[in-house]
From Swiss-Prot:
GO terms for molecular function: rRNA binding; structural constituent of ribosome. This is Small ribosomal subunit protein uS11. The keyword Ribosomal protein applies. One of its GO terms (biological process) is translation. Part of the 30S ribosomal subunit. Interacts with proteins S7 and S18. Binds to IF-3. The gene is rpsK. It comes from Prochlorococcus marinus (strain NATL1A).
Amino acid sequence: MATTSKKTGSKKSKRNVPNGVVHIQSTFNNTIVSITDTSGEVISWSSAGASGFKGARKGTPFAAQTAAELAARRALEQGMRQIEVLVRGPGSGRETAIRALQVAGLEITLIRDVTPLPHNGCRRPKRRRV
């Protein structure tokens, strides 16, 4: 009888990527940090929810800092040194995520705000009255 070998998950290959792009999407409810190489292939990612925060605490600056540290640690293991930072969204975790990337040991060469702005597109939802 022929025996088949069991696959126990996918083994990620360690590649040496010195330069990369960090995409920080910061909303009011969550912060998502994706680190890619220059061609756009994702090397590591993390979010406030994936870092263990739930509910309203996902939108805090501390949750964004924790998510950025986790993603940066994984990128440093792949050999990344220099990064460009693209920030999108109005959330409170923007600055703290950038600061956490710097403290983790990544050299930031560029910070760009790529928040999409409508040129008077769709009608906005009505204002909340609390």
